[in-house]
Regions:
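Phosphodiester-processing cores and adjacent nucleic acid-binding clamps
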Residues: 1-195
Length: 195
């Protein structure tokens, strides 16, 4: 099995708790490559809860650096820091962020993550990720932002979101996913053909 998780990376450090500066965090996917990587993943997740909890469990780059051995990291979805910077037009900042993660995890253990759930933002970001990968030599990986197993589970997932957020299904202003493409897709369905 592939064991991993998506973590929240604190805006500053995992110890900072200023509502104006630290409520926002970015996603990062961590996968255990080895037994040592699994142990490091457990340490990272444990410390995110015991040391970094502020609205949600958070990690920071010092914690990642301290426990990076045996871990593969992916830049995550649109909520990843690299993608977030690209969305606001900060290509140089995205490049620095990606190179920083490569420095933490190693040349072949950090990947830029391409996703295509049919979102307009992905259509804008993906070509920039490809460009960034070519310029930096950081490898690319095509994935899907999986929140449920099968496409037909989208409605059940929507109901669970309503329960989680104390909303009604008929509330037009509630949190919802934009479409039903957030399921576990086959390798063929995920293949990114725009390289």
């Amino acid at each position: 099995p592939i064991i991993g998780c998506e973590v929240y990376v604190a805006a500053r450090t995992r110890f900072d708790k200023d509502a104006d500066k630290d409520k926002q965090s970015n996603h990062l996917v961590l996968l255990a490559e080895t037994q040592e990587g699994y142990k490091n993943l457990v340490k990272i997740v444990s410390k995110s809860h015991t040391e970094g909890f502020y609205y949600k469990p958070r990690v920071d780059k010092d914690l990642l650096r301290e426990h990076s051995t045996g871990i593969i990291a992916l830049s995550a979805c649109l909520a990843g820091k690299v993608q977030s910077l690209l969305l606001v037009g900060d290509y140089d900042g995205a490049r620095r962020e990606a190179e920083g993660y490569r420095e933490i995890f190693g040349d072949q253990n950090f990947f830029l993550e391409l996703q295509d759930q049919g979102l307009e933002e992905e259509a804008r970001v993906n070509p920039l990720l490809v460009k960034l990968g070519k310029e930096t030599g950081i490898p690319l990986v095509a994935t899907n932002d999986v929140h449920y197993v099968n496409k037909e589970d989208a409605k059940a997932h929507d109901v669970l979101l309503c329960i989680q957020t104390a909303s009604r299904v008929d509330d037009e202003n509630r949190m919802r996913f934009p479409n039903d493409e957030f399921y576990l897709k086959s390798q063929e369905a995920v293949s990114y053909t725009h390289l």
